[in-house]
């Protein structure tokens, strides 16, 4: 089962992913978290489900890769994020990806491992931007993908809905 969670920025996609990852057995992968200084967002951390942490992007990072005001750290993305996806692919039943977005898509290695994961039999829960990027559209338009749109109205019920779908797909009792 391949589940994509989409929704506007700030609606709670990462919060939902973090809750799911705590509740689901044998999951691997990563999520991203805002970095704030004096109340202002200055970047994003990448955090693996097994506790590794790095910097995905910052406003003051020396990097040739840029998305908006953020300079993207491909080194940490690939050495921490991509590596966590490769480990999860080898060792886990469920792969968590937060997110398949503009910053992450700057990495060829990230795109390759995401394609490999989506082409496999592995279960996936990923957040994905509402985007017209060809790679994103290709993932969203797969026959084996179920897309959930997170919003203020379903924010509290979507967790249980996704858990039910995953459990049903895995043949577990509700």
From Swiss-Prot:
Keywords tagged on the record: ATP-binding, Hydrolase, Nucleotide-binding
EC number: 3.6.1.15
Principal EC category: hydrolase
Amino acids binding ATP: 7-14, 94-101
Keyword ATP-binding attributed: yes
Pfam families: NTPase_1
GO MF annotation: an example: ATP binding
SMART domains xrefs: AAA
Catalytic reaction(s) noted: a ribonucleoside 5'-triphosphate + H2O = a ribonucleoside 5'-diphosphate + phosphate + H(+)
HAMAP family reported in the protein's UniProt record: NTPase_1
NCBIfam families: PRK13695.1
Family classification: Belongs to the THEP1 NTPase family.
Function: Has nucleotide phosphatase activity towards ATP, GTP, CTP, TTP and UTP. May hydrolyze nucleoside diphosphates with lower efficiency.
Protein name in the entry: Nucleoside-triphosphatase THEP1
Organism: Thermotoga sp. (strain RQ2)
């Amino acid at each position: 089962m391949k589940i994509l969670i989409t929704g506007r920025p700030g609606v709670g996609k990462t919060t939902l992913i973090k809750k799911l990852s705590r509740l689901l057995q044998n999951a691997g992968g990563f999520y991203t978290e805002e970095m704030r200084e004096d109340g202002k967002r200055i970047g994003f951390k990448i955090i693996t489900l097994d506790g590794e942490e790095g910097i995905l992007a910052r406003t003051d990072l020396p990097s040739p890769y840029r998305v908006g005001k953020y300079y993207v750290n491909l080194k940490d993305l690939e050495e921490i994020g991509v590596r966590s996806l490769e480990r999860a692919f080898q060792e886990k039943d469920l792969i968590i990806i937060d997110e398949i977005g503009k910053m992450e898509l700057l990495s060829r290695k990230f795109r390759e491992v995401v394609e490999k994961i989506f082409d496999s039999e592995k279960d996936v829960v990923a957040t994905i931007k509402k985007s017209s990027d060809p790679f994103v559209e290709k993932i969203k338009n797969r026959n084996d993908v179920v897309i959930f749109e997170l919003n203020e109205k379903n924010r509290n019920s979507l967790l249980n809905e996704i858990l039910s779908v995953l459990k049903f797909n895995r043949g577990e009792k509700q």
